[in-house]
UniProtKB/Swiss-Prot annotation:
Pfam family, one: Ribosomal_L5_C
One GO-annotated biological process of the protein: translation
Domain of life: Bacteria
GO molecular function, one term: structural constituent of ribosome
Organism: Synechococcus sp. (strain CC9605)
Keywords of the record: Ribonucleoprotein, Ribosomal protein, RNA-binding, rRNA-binding, tRNA-binding
Gene name of the record: rplE
One GO CC annotation: ribosome
Protein name from the UniProt record: Large ribosomal subunit protein uL5
Length: 179
């Protein structure tokens, strides 16, 4: 059963009961997933940016947007408009497919994995996790990468509090650390 179907049929009614909500539309849901990668070396090395864009496109299955510097910062040797990273925003079916792959395939492949931190919520029910290596995703072959790079994954929800967001992600199968 796909994650989207499981959310509609089992997770949504269970959360409505657990959070004692009167309307099904009050139940928190995932709005979007943003995958972001900041590349300090992209200012000097254009190949690293190209490789990074290709990797993110493989992982997410969607076109990648190159992020550019808003201001020049001499200390970092960047000028305004220079490419300094890349990002992808996933919504709808692609978002659910990515979350399913992240939870069931990628996260368990992290070395010494004991669960993700339950403290990485932002106060409004959104969750951010950092991944140190891109090779945890099955789409990336270890032989074809030039360097190990990480990424930030932000899961934006309609939850009104961290507790609601945590309940939603726990029901979806997110492996949180137990103290």
């Amino acid at each position: 059963m796909s994650l989207k179907k499981r959310y509609r049929e089992t997770i949504q009614p269970k959360l409505q009961k657990d959070l004692s909500l009167t309307n099904i539309h009050e139940v928190p849901k995932v709005l979007k997933v943003t995958v972001n990668r900041g590349l300090g070396e992209a200012a000097a090395n254009a190949k690293s940016l190209e490789a990074s864009v290709n990797e993110l496109a493989q992982i997410t299955g969607q076109k990648v947007v190159v992020t550019r510097a808003k201001k020049a910062i001499a200390g970092f040797k960047i000028r305004q408009g220079m490419p300094i990273g890349c990002a992808v925003t996933l919504r709808g079916d692609r978002m659910y497919a990515f979350l399913e792959r992240l939870i069931n395939l990628a996260l368990p492949r992290i070395r010494d994995f004991r669960g993700v931190s339950p403290k990485s919520f932002d106060g409004r029910g959104n969750y951010t996790l950092g991944v140190r290596e891109q090779i945890i995703f099955p789409e990336i072959s270890f032989d074809k990468i030039d360097a190990i790079r990480g990424m930030d994954i932000t899961i934006v929800t309609t939850a009104r509090s961290d507790e609601e967001g945590r309940a939603l992600l726990r029901e979806m199968g997110m492996p949180f650390q137990s103290n």
